[in-house]
Design a protein with these regions (language model features):
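N-terminal signal-anchor module of multipass membrane proteins
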Residues: 1-53, 59-62
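Alpha-helical transmembrane segments
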Residues: 5-17, 76-90, 138-153
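Membrane-embedded alpha-helical segments in integral membrane proteins
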Residues: 6-7, 59-72, 187-196
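Transmembrane alpha-helical segments that form the membrane-embedded catalytic/substrate-channel core
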Residues: 18-25, 92-97, 149-162
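Membrane-interfacial helix termini and the short, flexible loops that connect transmembrane helices
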Residues: 30-43, 70-77, 96-112, 162-174
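Membrane-interface helix-loop-helix modules in multi-pass inner-membrane proteins
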Residues: 50-118, 132
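Long, contiguous internal "core" modules enriched in hydrophobic/ aromatic residues
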Residues: 101-198
Length: 198
């Protein structure tokens, strides 16, 4: 495989996360800030899945990369690309359904399920991104760091967005969640700086 090739999956992944991290974060944060079905539906109303076509853009881009490197089929790099595609497709489909069927997806149990899936999916994306960056090492330190950071960053972004867009007590809880996640992210970066220094 061309040594330049692994750059492109990472580029597509980075652009996808830049564009789609808010929707992942809203799905992740909803059970932590919403207290009832109406508040769950208010969070779901902030989702804009499918409309921006971010998932379609990612699928198109990474599919081109995967098909352009047939020799990679079966190796860790190829598996990482396929893992990202899979969680992106399922996550996008869930958010599209949730946006259109708020009464069904607004239940506490389903929202917790979506939150759990979002957290696990961001871990998969993080480990896959680490694999792309390290040339195939799936369980690398880079992947672990990216995975935790993705969850924190997506949660923080969603909490900030909810705090700005929602004005009732739900908005207050979003502001509190943003403050807590900001402190956690600061501690995370300080911890990483300490480890790197050591």
């Amino acid at each position: 495989m061309n040594s330049v090739t692994p750059i492109w999956p990472a580029v597509f992944l980075g652009m996808y996360l830049f564009l789609e991290s808010l929707d992942w974060g809203l799905s992740l944060a909803a059970p932590f800030v919403a207290r009832n079905q109406e508040e769950n539906k208010a969070v779901l109303s902030l989702l804009k899945p499918g409309i921006d076509l971010n998932e379609a853009w990612l699928i198109f881009g990474l599919s081109l990369v995967a098909s352009a490197v047939p020799a990679a089929a079966g190796d860790t790099m190829h598996d990482s690309v396929m893992a990202v595609l899979s969680v992106a497709v399922v996550g996008g489909a869930l958010r599209i359904l949730a946006a259109f069927f708020k009464n069904v997806f607004g239940s506490a149990l389903i929202m917790k399920g979506m939150s759990l899936y979002s957290a696990l999916a961001l871990f998969v994306i993080g480990f896959s991104g680490g694999s792309m960056m390290t040339g195939g090492d799936l369980m690398s330190g880079v992947g672990i760091v990216i995975s935790f950071w993705l969850n924190l960053a997506a949660f923080e972004l969603a909490a900030l967005y909810g705090a700005v867009k929602i004005m009732n007590p739900l908005g207050e809880r979003c502001r509190a969640a943003f403050l807590v996640s900001s402190i956690l992210q600061l501690l995370f970066f300080l911890g990483m700086a300490f480890l790197l220094k050591g």
